Amino acid sequence: MARQEPRSRRCHDDEVVDPYAWMRAADKDDPEVRAYLEAENAWTEAAMANTSQLQEQLFGEIKGRIKETDLSVPVRKGAWWYYSRTLEGAQYPIHCRKPAVQGDERAPGDEVGEQVMLDQNVEAGDAEFFAVGAFDTTPDARVLAWSSDTEGDELYTMRFRDLASGEDLPDEIAGTYYGTAWGADNQTFFYVRPDEAMRPYQLWRHRLGTQASDDVLVHTEDDDRFFLGVGTTKDERFLVLGMESKVTSEAWVLEASDPTGTFRVVEPRHQDVEYGLEHWNDRFFIVTNADGAENFKLVSAPADSPGRDHWTDVVTHRPEVKLSGIDVFAGHLVLFERAEGLRQIRVQALGADAALGDDHVIDQPEMVGSASGGANPEFDSRVLRYGYSSMVTPSSVFDYDMDTRQRTLLKRQPVLGGYDSDRYVTERLWAMADDGAVVPISMVRRADRLRDITAPVLLYGYGSYEASMDPTFSSARLSLLDRGFVFAIAPVRGGGEMGRRWYTEGKLLAKCTTFSDFMACAHYLIEQGWTSPSRLAIRGGSAGGLLVGAVLNMAPGLFGAAVAEVPFVDVVEAILDAALPLTVLEWEEWGNPVESAEVYAYMKGYDPYLNIEAREYPPLLVTAGINDPRVPYWQPAKWVARLRATKTDSNPLLLKTEMGAGHMGPSGRYDAWRDEALVYAFLIDALGVSSLPDPAAGPLSPFGDPTPGPFASDPPGPFAS
């Protein structure tokens, strides 16, 4: 049992006594805190000792399905093909490129002429944690700006590599964040710094060959609700400085050919108006929710006068379709949309005067699947690179000729061991929420796993930040399916699966809708005979961990086991403290309990930590990261301590803290697979499922998606997983 030291906090005439507030130490290296976390780790290891053989078996299965030595699909940018390689036994990818042969549009097929840009295994050395943030070449492709984090705290050190020699230049910049851009002169580099609360708030300019101390501060975002980012338009003509809160945005642009010039605003910020842009032939295409376009619309404006007074509708608002983003090509406009809860891609012909031609949605092979944009850095191309996956179809990369509508499969994620998709079935079920809304559950199971109240079911949820949990493939998950599990995703409100209103109906003073939707999905699965409470497990991470914690308090008898990864569970404590990382940004998501007594009372009503009661809770596995800047370690640590002291059952309650990592968990792929094996072993043991896969599944069948290439996008928001 953890030591109790009651401390009180008063807000809106309400006093809260917290016996474990001492765990929120000023220094995460506080000896007592570390001793407690290490003791919990030891307890978890001892409690899971009976599953050690099962964990090894699961790890072997997960690893055995992976083509460990593999190659990502090369991406053409300018005179080079870019790709990443993985090697058997190596934790991290190796980022490479090869020169493109003039007139040959085919991707390279061997290693002849390969140039290693960055070998993460070499750079990581003996570091317990290693993550790459920036990976950005100059327009002439001679210098690579790259950054690394060796703690998991998401503070990156920026370096610059001469790609001809393979050596890093003397320039080095510590304390940077996500977001970079190069000027057209190949010498001027823009980067972002966070403040002490980890809010990215300053744009800086560096010139190659100079000291970081000589760098120029270009812009500071003074509004604590906003974070700052930088990038370039696809044609690399404009640098784009973006400032965003949860509900409002503003963009400034600067000609990349004039990198020391002054950024100019596109449209000044207006509360609750969001927009983002791309450049095309002296015009900006702008995705926005202005003028009541709840699900967003597309407008255009001249690049020299891009303000709202000059916006012209291109694709009007559609209540049934959410416009999530766009890509632009010389002769085509690509719209990334969401309809009926699923992602789709629409291709629109584009005339020289920006006139729209015929449009069509790219056909997909299954009723329940997910299409997503790929890496498309080339503006003058008629070929769209995109990805597709479903819960039974491994991640697939296609090239799509937007004129002929012909698609070419470039690669499907290899699943070793004889995986046969026909042995599995994916489907959608429709659960009725308390207020009559319909929640579309995505499910996958073995084809021979029929409806059965004894079936073990794992129900996953998130439900915050308008993030969407799409039905995609996981080869690791096969280890559960082959043991008879049914896996289901509950896309509850607060997420973005069904459009913008789906999000707004699950935030602020409607946050409890997220939890009631999730419980409605659980009740539906039970009522329809798919499982029973003792065989129903739930899982969620970060804000999804809040979901898990809240529903365990509201209906602990509804679930047979739970996994909460880096869970956001000390909600009131975190959101009251404006000095904590990212808190002020979060007020537009959760509400501001400092100013509003109504928000405070509502938030306190669902806070997982404050609503623990002396009752039985199901077996629970909780994870944390000592260096986590998004959900600090003390949130899951306090939650577990209070649960252990209060609950009345003897069910397992386990806390596993990564002592050298942050929010994203361990950085190496083998370490991540071992963590997944631990979670699966816990679920199998807690639900009393056979530890052996059913031989009727056939031979045991890469874990997650293929390694992202150098043009991967930035990570999600503050409490996202």
Located regions from the model:
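A flexible loop/linker signature enriched in serine peptidases of the S9 family
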Residues: 86-93, 124-129, 148-157, 172-175, ...
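Hydrophobic beta-strand positions that form the internal "hydrophobic ladder"
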Residues: 81, 144-146, 189, 239, ...
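Cap/lid segment of the alpha/beta-hydrolase catalytic domain
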Residues: 117-138, 147-153, 164-169, 402-406, ...
